[in-house]
Amino acid sequence: MARITVEDCLDKVENRFQLVLLASKRARVLARHPEEAKVTWDNDKPTVVALREIAEGHITPAYMKEKVKTDRYPIERPMPAPRDDLADLDDDI
């Protein structure tokens, strides 16, 4: 697992500031939707995968203008069933 460097990515974007914005936007998408990765994960974090995608040319500065899939609201999880050992506590009050 080779580490990615900023110099690898700067060939694809104009400056470091644009690189930060591009990588952070892509990393947020990858954190919520890991199946959309254009490179293999190799047990990396979303930020590393985003930088690898930029270095390999899969993600370009045009990505900043694209609308991305976001989940504005958290996933609703079902409430857990009441435990039997806690059901008798209401009777004691």
From Swiss-Prot:
Gene name of the encoded protein: rpoZ
Top-rank lineage group of the source organism: Bacteria
Name this polypeptide is given: DNA-directed RNA polymerase subunit omega
Complex and partners: The RNAP catalytic core consists of 2 alpha, 1 beta, 1 beta' and 1 omega subunit. When a sigma factor is associated with the core the holoenzyme is formed, which can initiate transcription.
HAMAP family (UniProt xref): RNApol_bact_RpoZ
Gene Ontology biological-process entries: DNA-templated transcription
Species this chain originates from: Methylococcus capsulatus (strain ATCC 33009 / NCIMB 11132 / Bath)
This protein's record includes keyword Disulfide bond: no
GO molecular function terms attached to this record: DNA binding; DNA-directed RNA polymerase activity
Record-listed E.C. numbers: 2.7.7.6
Catalytic activity entry: RNA(n) + a ribonucleoside 5'-triphosphate = RNA(n+1) + diphosphate
First-tier enzyme category under EC: transferase
UniProt keyword Nucleotidyltransferase present: yes
